[in-house]
Amino acid sequence: MLEFMDYVQLAFAEATRWNQDNSYSALTATAESLLDFHVPERLQVRLSSLSTPHFATSYTLGTVGLIDGSVSYLFSTVPLNNTPSQSGLIPLRRLVRGYRQIEAPVPPRRNWGWDAIPSPNSLQNIDGAENNDDVVRKATLLHATLHLPPPSTLNALFLRRISPTTQITASLVSTQAPPLVKSAPSAALLAQISHDTGTFSNEYLFSTDNALFGWRGLWNIGLEPAPGKASTDKVSLLSAGAEAYYSPISSLVGLSTGLKFTTLPAASRTPSSSSSGSTPNPISSFPYTLTLTLTPLTGSLSTTYSARASPNLAFSSRFGFNVYSWESEMVAGCEIWRKSPRTEPVEVDDGLEWARRKMGIVKDLAAEKISSLSSSNNPQAIEEDEGDSVIKIRVDQSWNVRLLWEGRVKSLLVTAGVSLGPGSFTALSSIPSSPTSSSAPVAAAGTGSSQSSGGGAAPTSRPSYWQGVGVSILYSS
């Protein structure tokens, strides 16, 4: 489940109509959402609030032997007036990342506040001719998170839209030095420039850590849409991309390439009864996504296949192979949504009306029109209100299993999961005299738990089959 601050950043991207799916970093996002989901390892409580349309806060408290937590603040120059912030009103499908039914990328238009907040006098010209006087200030987002207790870590993010097709991002990570070490806190800065034209997407990166330079690119083959208009008749999309990294200090070189084939909403659209002479769709009646990634330097090859058999059921599988070591990996998973019948509320109060009145913001028809424009680019806008809970299951070739349940309990968003597998049995049987060595295979299995099952027991005791279990609770207002 997305954290509240990630949810607000997603709302910011939708408000400014920046397509996060049109990037090489999101090439395998569908398979990763279904196969690489995180299982909580402890009890964690989050309290979040979108106190004003421009400002959000979040507090986290967790325990795993030691009590730790974090404090987060976020500021956006774009008013998030129509973003649900109460945990009882946020659609669960917007927080849980599952199968992603994407739409054909659309180039940005210049006659809307793509990179700025439109002035009130220009809201009526959303669909009209070009208006260059609606720019008040650039769309900017500031986010900072402080992780406690010491050694504390500070994460900061600066995001700014500088043109219809360009966005800059700067991320900072600073860690406090240990108490006995008298030195300045270590810090690393990552700067990124993203350029998206719909057909092409390029990202240029630089990190102060080892002076790392990077580039990521994605090309949507055969896609030439008009600015501001989506291709509603296109049934599939083929994308090719690559990334490259180089560090002159450490002589580090990285290279990967990939392909993705995915169906678009037109492929699963049911023909109307009036069009009796229409031919059946040659692609498929259900959405699916295929990806192929190759890392030539390490010899790694990976393929994924994800399909949504129904609106409440999705499957995914991944097969990886290394041509140098002859090692292979096979993972399969699925997600099952459950929805209960409920009556549609007449009017929903998000609790921010007092803030709008104080800031002089009127929730008029033009503001609702902007909201409909940004939500029209979301392929899950129709079904995002459906679903009260979801179960995710993941199993690999070593029979390491992850089980996750995410749902709504009253006004709380709850995540509960467990990871288990036979890795601990093999570890203790091979090296019975070293109880701490059993944690290495567990961590290598990717279950996310570093606790050893036999760390405090005698070598002759039978280890536990459990590898990790936890619960996370979120409340937002």
From Swiss-Prot:
It comes from Talaromyces marneffei (strain ATCC 18224 / CBS 334.59 / QM 7333) (Penicillium marneffei). The gene is mdm10. Component of the ER-mitochondria encounter structure (ERMES) or MDM complex, composed of mmm1, mdm10, mdm12 and mdm34. Associates with the mitochondrial outer membrane sorting assembly machinery SAM(core) complex. The keyword Transmembrane applies. Residues 430-465 are annotated as: Disordered. Pfam families: MDM10. Lacks alpha-helical transmembrane segments, suggesting that it resides in the membrane via beta-sheet conformations similar to those predicted for other outer membrane proteins and porin. It is found in: Mitochondrion outer membrane. It is a multi-pass membrane protein. Component of the ERMES/MDM complex, which serves as a molecular tether to connect the endoplasmic reticulum and mitochondria. Components of this complex are involved in the control of mitochondrial shape and protein biogenesis and may function in phospholipid exchange. mdm10 is involved in the late assembly steps of the general translocase of the mitochondrial outer membrane (TOM complex). Functions in the tom40-specific route of the assembly of outer membrane beta-barrel proteins, including the association of tom40 with the receptor tom22 and small TOM proteins. Keywords: Membrane, Mitochondrion, Mitochondrion outer membrane, Transmembrane, Transmembrane beta strand. This is Mitochondrial distribution and morphology protein 10. Residues 430-452 have a biased composition (Low complexity). One of its GO terms (biological process) is mitochondrial genome maintenance. The keyword Membrane applies. One of its GO terms (cellular component) is ERMES complex. Belongs to the MDM10 family. It comes from the Eukaryota.
